[in-house]
């Protein structure tokens, strides 16, 4: 792949970003990092090197295989090489299929076959391409196997040692051999190979508690395990063991050729064997100690075998000086010093941490590593060395970018290396590009016209979406609208296209509202949306279409290529556990969660939070939480005093975890004002809402008292209503079921029987509404009555037994009533029966009492509380 193509792929990520949606804010209570706490790799792209190529030592002409494995299958693998002939030169990408290098790929594993030649020796790297991201492995060295003598001199005369029985003898045979890799040793006595008592002595032959049978001629041989080459060392040892009783007493001392001190270098984690030279007569007793290492001898990892001290699983703090003290009772005693160096491979303890950075800003990244010797730190920006970047400066463990440019967007890796190996860590650098303002026409000062409104405002497009796999058929998109003063956006539409020839863009049906026209951060406003009904094992591109207030639209740049992998091919993501939903305020809650102790945070880019009211069965609102280290977040705004249900899932650039268990929480209730309320005027009402404690914390006794009082008041009101109704019924008559005609007749009383005390009530008349069906006929009759006042009518002579004035008034009232009855009888034949019955009743009363004067009926006063309406019946008037 050419550099031009690589640059085009990188450009697609320049404006990509991972931000939270508007409803999210960082929790105010966030634990601070201690000075020794390592930052997690954030934001992580979700991909990493699982198995880097290992350094190899091989003979000339051999073929070796370097393997590299990534956590996810990349779009492609590439290998780079730096020759050992020019160590100062940079790495160069290899051409595959050549005679000296052949690359093959199987899923997420790449293999490089190399023929060992002088020009193929050197360092190799594996490079994985994930869209615009470039992830580089640590360096593997390919070295040539070799074995040689340090000083090729003429053979020396054999060593002649004479010791008494019971002593321990140490012979350093392999001090003159240099081998890569380390040689394996064979020892011979009188030409016969013997098995050494201790293995891994690096060319030292140790014989403990020698006897006369140990006497003889000793020699050694070095073998290169890679090439199989063997070297017979020229030196030899002639050992003579004498009986102890024949030897004279001698203080502990060293034999000819034995070192007075030793210096040993070992790799951390290996087993360390310290051997103490020296003999005496009688054989001395050995005591081990160390002035530098506390508890170096007396611990679970240390074992003492007389003249030998073995320390397993060596650690860095085991380095120091060890003393072998020998004493046999004959002065002086012997002290032998051994200096131990423990080397440690590099390990990055504080990886770089890059947040969203504006284009043109200054960025400082730190990378702290441990190791012995002290590791060297170097940086790669999307696979390219920072040394070649004009904006980059290296200062101790820091990488300083004086001005962040678009080409810096991508994966930034820190490497720590020493002679034992390399270690790397990386972070995703996101660059927020500058918004390019369209130049205004020159020629005078431009003054804004308030009447123009938003006519000349610019349409700023959203950033390209970041894509995360949700399921085998769906993805989550995240994008941002940078802060600007352009035309407001109304809605968004999501478009996607399958990569391939003749594949068209498709638009989803959902309209994604812009929401409130305000920025949720200094950088702008973020959004999320999901796309479903995709096909696994296919590559897609996505873009966002923004619709503005002028009904015009503008598209974002397309996303990087996204390969939708099936879930079976992905490692499961850590599932967060919701611990608590904190009632933060009336419109906000804070989510608290945790991860399992064995969860790998390096796989996590952030978290998705889903929430909705518990009473709703609709879709969940979505929120994005950035950073694998986040353990709490505030969600706002929410409805007051409303119960919500929440669930979480972690995500990376290529996949998302399973959902956490649902957990419910609610926002706080409105707080009751503690100030004194003003006096309520007429028509006002108290609308103060009781607080949560006032509503639910009343004592049971108070509750029972209030309830009992309310019941008594209801009973009292019911009793009063019943008594009033009964009195009202009695005042209307004892027979509530008597006919309406009889009731109407009772409304008129005989004038002769009327007592003087009721004269004041005679002016109160009943108002009778005519039948609506006969209103027109009644109106015509009334007009006829007005024109014919002398119409004849029949009336029995009446006698009055009281005041003449009252007699004249009653007579006039009766004449009007009789004329009304006669007109009704003439106009509505259906009512004659009722009128006749009424007249007949009056006449029958006169016949039955012939001796009494005729009765004249007058209207009886009615209570004002009763209203008579006879319009629904057939009676239209009253008969006398």
Swiss-Prot record:
<keyword id="KW-0358">Heparin-binding</keyword>
<dbReference type="GO" id="GO:0007379">
    <property type="term" value="P:segment specification"/>
</dbReference>
<keyword id="KW-0654">Proteoglycan</keyword>
<dbReference type="InterPro" id="IPR003961">
    <property type="entry name" value="FN3_dom"/>
</dbReference>
<feature type="domain" description="Ig-like C2-type 4">
    <location>
        <begin position="346"/>
        <end position="432"/>
    </location>
</feature>
<feature type="binding site">
    <location>
        <position position="501"/>
    </location>
    <ligand>
        <name>heparin</name>
    </ligand>
</feature>
<feature type="disulfide bond">
    <location>
        <begin position="173"/>
        <end position="220"/>
    </location>
</feature>
<dbReference type="Pfam" id="PF13927">
    <property type="entry name" value="Ig_3"/>
</dbReference>
<dbReference type="GO" id="GO:0071694">
    <property type="term" value="P:maintenance of protein location in extracellular region"/>
</dbReference>
<feature type="compositionally biased region" description="Low complexity">
    <location>
        <begin position="823"/>
        <end position="837"/>
    </location>
</feature>
<keyword id="KW-0732">Signal</keyword>
<dbReference type="InterPro" id="IPR036179">
    <property type="entry name" value="Ig-like_dom_sf"/>
</dbReference>
<feature type="disulfide bond">
    <location>
        <begin position="276"/>
        <end position="324"/>
    </location>
</feature>
<feature type="glycosylation site" description="N-linked (GlcNAc...) asparagine">
    <location>
        <position position="102"/>
    </location>
</feature>
<keyword id="KW-1133">Transmembrane helix</keyword>
<keyword id="KW-0393">Immunoglobulin domain</keyword>
<dbReference type="GO" id="GO:0005113">
    <property type="term" value="F:patched binding"/>
</dbReference>
<dbReference type="GO" id="GO:0048749">
    <property type="term" value="P:compound eye development"/>
</dbReference>
<feature type="disulfide bond">
    <location>
        <begin position="367"/>
        <end position="414"/>
    </location>
</feature>
<dbReference type="InterPro" id="IPR013783">
    <property type="entry name" value="Ig-like_fold"/>
</dbReference>
<dbReference type="GO" id="GO:0007411">
    <property type="term" value="P:axon guidance"/>
</dbReference>
<feature type="topological domain" description="Extracellular">
    <location>
        <begin position="21"/>
        <end position="703"/>
    </location>
</feature>
<feature type="region of interest" description="Disordered">
    <location>
        <begin position="728"/>
        <end position="762"/>
    </location>
</feature>
<dbReference type="GO" id="GO:0009986">
    <property type="term" value="C:cell surface"/>
</dbReference>
<dbReference type="GO" id="GO:0097108">
    <property type="term" value="F:hedgehog family protein binding"/>
</dbReference>
<dbReference type="InterPro" id="IPR036116">
    <property type="entry name" value="FN3_sf"/>
</dbReference>
<comment type="subunit">
    <text>Homodimer. Heterotetramer; 2 iHog chains bind 2 hh chains when facilitated by heparin, heparin is required to promote high-affinity interactions between hh and iHog.</text>
</comment>
<dbReference type="GO" id="GO:0016020">
    <property type="term" value="C:membrane"/>
</dbReference>
<comment type="similarity">
    <text>Belongs to the immunoglobulin superfamily. IHOG family.</text>
</comment>
<protein>
    <recommendedName>
        <fullName>Interference hedgehog</fullName>
    </recommendedName>
</protein>
<feature type="transmembrane region" description="Helical">
    <location>
        <begin position="704"/>
        <end position="724"/>
    </location>
</feature>
<keyword id="KW-0325">Glycoprotein</keyword>
<dbReference type="GO" id="GO:0035017">
    <property type="term" value="P:cuticle pattern formation"/>
</dbReference>
<feature type="glycosylation site" description="N-linked (GlcNAc...) asparagine">
    <location>
        <position position="466"/>
    </location>
</feature>
<feature type="compositionally biased region" description="Low complexity">
    <location>
        <begin position="864"/>
        <end position="880"/>
    </location>
</feature>
<feature type="binding site">
    <location>
        <position position="497"/>
    </location>
    <ligand>
        <name>heparin</name>
    </ligand>
</feature>
<feature type="signal peptide">
    <location>
        <begin position="1"/>
        <end position="20"/>
    </location>
</feature>
<dbReference type="GO" id="GO:0008201">
    <property type="term" value="F:heparin binding"/>
</dbReference>
<feature type="binding site">
    <location>
        <position position="541"/>
    </location>
    <ligand>
        <name>heparin</name>
    </ligand>
</feature>
<feature type="topological domain" description="Cytoplasmic">
    <location>
        <begin position="725"/>
        <end position="880"/>
    </location>
</feature>
<dbReference type="GO" id="GO:0005886">
    <property type="term" value="C:plasma membrane"/>
</dbReference>
<feature type="region of interest" description="Disordered">
    <location>
        <begin position="429"/>
        <end position="467"/>
    </location>
</feature>
């Amino acid at each position: 792949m050419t550099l031009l193509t690589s640059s085009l792929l990188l450009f697609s990520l320049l404006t990509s970003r991972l931000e939270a949606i508007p409803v999210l804010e960082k929790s105010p209570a966030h634990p601070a990092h201690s000075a020794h706490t390592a930052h997690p790799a954030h934001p992580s792209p979700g991909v990493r090197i699982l198995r880097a190529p290992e350094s190899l030592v091989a003979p000339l002409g051999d073929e070796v295989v370097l393997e590299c494995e990534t956590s996810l299958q990349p779009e492609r693998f590439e290998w780079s090489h730096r020759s050992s002939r020019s160590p100062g030169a940079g790495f160069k990408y290899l051409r595959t299929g050549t005679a000296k290098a052949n690359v093959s790929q199987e899923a997420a594993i790449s293999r490089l076959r190399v023929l060992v030649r002088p020009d193929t020796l050197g360092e190799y790297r594996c490079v994985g391409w994930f869209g615009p991201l470039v992830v580089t492995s640590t360096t593997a060295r390919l070295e040539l196997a070799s074995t040689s003598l340090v000083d090729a001199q003429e053979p020396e005369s054999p060593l002649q040692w004479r010791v008494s029985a019971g002593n321990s003898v140490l012979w350093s045979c392999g001090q003159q051999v240099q081998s890569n890799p380390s040689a394996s040793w064979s020892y011979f006595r009188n030409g016969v190979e013997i098995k050494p008592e201790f293995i891994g002595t690096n060319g030292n032959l140790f014989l403990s508690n020698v006897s006369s049978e140990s006497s003889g001629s000793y020699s050694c041989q070095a073998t290169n395990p890679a090439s199989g080459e063997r070297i017979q060392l020229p030196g030899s040892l002639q050992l003579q063991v004498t009986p102890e009783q024949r030897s004279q007493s001698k203080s502990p001392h060293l034999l000819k050729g034995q070192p007075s001190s030793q210096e040993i270098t070992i790799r951390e984690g290996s087993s360390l064997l310290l051997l103490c030279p020296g003999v005496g007569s009688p054989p001395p007793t050995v005591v081990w100690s160390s002035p530098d290492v506390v508890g170096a001898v007396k611990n679970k990892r240390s074992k003492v075998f007389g003249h030998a001290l073995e320390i397993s699983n060596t650690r860095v703090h085991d380095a120091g000086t060890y003393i072998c003290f020998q004493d046999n009772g004959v002065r002086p005693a012997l002290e032998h010093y051994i200096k131990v160096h423990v080397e440690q491979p590099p390990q990055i303890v504080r990886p770089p941490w890059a947040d969203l950075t504006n284009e043109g800003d200054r960025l400082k990244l730190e990378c702290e590593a441990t190791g012995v010797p002290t590791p060297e730190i170097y940086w790669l920006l999307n696979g390219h060395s920072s040394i070649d970047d004009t904006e980059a400066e290296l200062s101790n463990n820091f990488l300083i970018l004086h001005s962040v440019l678009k080409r810096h967007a991508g994966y930034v890796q820190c490497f720590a290396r020493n002679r034992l190996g390399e270690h790397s860590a990386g972070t995703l650098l996101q660059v927020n590009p500058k918004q390019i303002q369209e130049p205004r026409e020159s020629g005078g000062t431009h003054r804004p016209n308030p009447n123009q409104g938003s006519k000349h405002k610019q349409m700023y497009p959203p950033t390209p979406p970041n894509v995360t796999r949700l399921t085998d058929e769906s993805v989550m998109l995240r994008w941002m609208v940078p802060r600007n003063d352009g035309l407001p956006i109304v809605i968004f539409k999501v478009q996607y296209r399958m990569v391939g020839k003749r594949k068209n863009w498709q638009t989803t049906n959902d309209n994604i509202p812009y929401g409130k026209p305000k920025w949720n951060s200094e950088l702008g406003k973020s959004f999320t949306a999901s796309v479903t009904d995709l096909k696994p094992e296919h590559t897609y591109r996505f873009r966002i279409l923004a619709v503005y207030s002028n009904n015009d639209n503008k598209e974002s740049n397309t996303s990087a290529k996204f390969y939708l992998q099936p879930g079976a091919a992905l490692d499961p993501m850590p599932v967060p556990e919701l611990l608590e939903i904190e009632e933060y305020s009336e419109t906000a809650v804070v989510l608290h969660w945790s991860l399992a102790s064995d969860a790998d945070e390096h796989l996590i880019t952030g978290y998705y939070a889903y929430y909705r009211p518990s009473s709703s069965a609709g879709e969940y609102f979505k929120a994005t939480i950035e950073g694998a280290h986040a353990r709490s977040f505030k969600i706002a705004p929410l409805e007051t005093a409303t119960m919500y249900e929440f669930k979480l899932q972690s995500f990376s650039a290529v996949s998302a975890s399973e959902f956490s268990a649902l957990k419910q929480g609610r926002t706080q209730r409105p707080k009751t004002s503690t100030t004194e309320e003003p006096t309520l005027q007429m028509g006002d009402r108290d609308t103060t809402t009781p607080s949560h404690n006032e509503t639910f914390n009343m004592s049971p006794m108070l509750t029972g008292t209030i309830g009992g009082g309310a019941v008594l008041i209801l009973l009292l009101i019911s009793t009063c209503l019943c008594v009033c109704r009964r009195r009202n019924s009695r005042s209307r008559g004892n027979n509530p079921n008597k006919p309406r005609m009889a009731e109407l007749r009772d409304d008129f009383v005989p004038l002769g029987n009327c007592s003087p005390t009721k004269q004041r009530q005679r002016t109160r008349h009943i108002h009778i509404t005519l039948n609506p069906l006969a209103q027109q006929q009644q109106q015509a009759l009334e007009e006829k009555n007005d024109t014919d006042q002398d119409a004849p009518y029949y009336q029995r002579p009446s006698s009055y037994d009281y005041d003449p004035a009252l007699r004249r008034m009653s007579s006039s009232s009766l004449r009007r009533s009789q004329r009304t009855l006669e007109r009704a009888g003439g106009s509505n034949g259906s009512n004659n029966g009722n009128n006749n019955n009424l007249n007949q009743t009056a006449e029958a009363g006169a016949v039955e009492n012939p001796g009494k004067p005729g009765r004249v009926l007058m209207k009886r006063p009615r209570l004002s509380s009763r209203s008579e309406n006879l319009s629904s019946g057939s009676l239209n008037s009253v008969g006398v």
